[in-house]
Amino acid sequence: MASIFSKIISKEIPCYKIAENKEFIAFLDINPNSTGHTLCIPKIEVDDFLDLEKESYNKLMSFSRDVALAIKKVIPCKRIGMSLIGLEVPHVHVHIIPISSMEDMQFVKKIKLNHKQFDSLAKEINAAYSLSNSI
């Protein structure tokens, strides 16, 4: 059964896209822990990251790192946190979260952004990503 992420990949559902290549896509989480909270996912539908081939896992981590570097250029934060949980959506996804405290990684407090804020943020992070990955 297709997950919501598969529907984003197939463009049945829109997203605030940050980056994309032939294997992965990154987009803003619409229920973010902090401004810039992004999800990086493989385009193949795999439930658990342990089920990814080692090469695909390594490529996902590399892609996620590139996305995190772009986010760090745009969002003021102390660090970029990363988490693989996968309990809510049965599709491997890496949370890339700008953090200033441990609380930002707890998935309890959420922030609200409107469409205009999400759209502007996605464009800004995408520009930073594109600039860094155009070499």
Q: Residues of each region from the PLM?
A:
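HIT superfamily nucleotide-processing domains
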Residues: 1-135
